[in-house]
Amino acid sequence: MSDMHSLLIAAILGVVEGLTEFLPVSSTGHMIIVGHLLGFEGDTAKTFEVVIQLGSILAVVVMFWRRLFGLIGIHFGRPLQHEGESKGRLTLIHILLGMIPAVVLGLLFHDTIKSLFNPINVMYALVVGGLLLIAAECLKPKEPRAPGLDDMTYRQAFMIGCFQCLALWPGFSRSGATISGGMLMGVSRYAASEFSFLLAVPMMMGATALDLYKSWGFLTNGDIPMFAVGFITAFVVALIAIKTFLQLIKRISFIPFAIYRFIVAAAVYVVFF
């Protein structure tokens, strides 16, 4: 693979990762399709995907840095704006409660989960995740019990964490699972999305660090330029995608995302079967 060709592939996959990682459409499904079409598969490709995920995570850190530092008691300048109608405040405990279920299951069944990474499982996950998004829109309370991020209860955070376990099924979408779970638990669409992004930082950093540790042997010095391009591209695109997404969901429901998931599932079927 020529240098320019590999850098082009890195940029394309970085765009795909950045666009889809935090939207409820399954980045895994997209990466499988695009990687296959580009002929970029195997151990190096898996390591590359782990590295560019770090770029996407960094975008969330940049977007929510004041809120993230606030969770650990570090404040800069003016007090963090309160988001909600109650006098509550989102705390680190909410994040920990949201992490526990998936962390426990992920550690117990890590190898089993990795064995599920194949097109047929991803295709089914895309469909089921789309149905969950539709169910969340149809069954959510008419008036959210937690309109803002700071209105969330510990119970809601834990239940969102339980829904996050669905994302251990490759192709389901972590954001799709957590946002749907939040809405069904009475959290507003916007607040559920924000919580999903915040929850992504420790969850994805932990999972990515573990995967990177296990895949480090496949990384060579010659891969560094390609990995750097993918990382930077994923970071920039994810930053734009998150900002756009948070504005978009103020005006539309998740039904279009569900329909799009069904289209991607059909694409997986066409490409692989």
Swiss-Prot record:
GO biological process: cell wall organization; peptidoglycan biosynthetic process; regulation of cell shape; response to antibiotic
Stretches that traverse the bilayer: 6-26, 45-65, 90-110, 116-136, 190-210, 222-242, 252-272
Membrane topology: Multi-pass membrane protein
Superkingdom in the source lineage: Bacteria
Localisation: Cell inner membrane
EC number assigned by the record: 3.6.1.27
NCBIfam families: PRK00281.1-1, PRK00281.1-2, PRK00281.1-4, undec_PP_bacA
Family: Belongs to the UppP family.
Entry function: Catalyzes the dephosphorylation of undecaprenyl diphosphate (UPP). Confers resistance to bacitracin.
Protein name: Undecaprenyl-diphosphatase
Organism: Escherichia coli O7:K1 (strain IAI39 / ExPEC)
Upper classification of the organism: Bacteria, Pseudomonadati, Pseudomonadota, Gammaproteobacteria, Enterobacterales
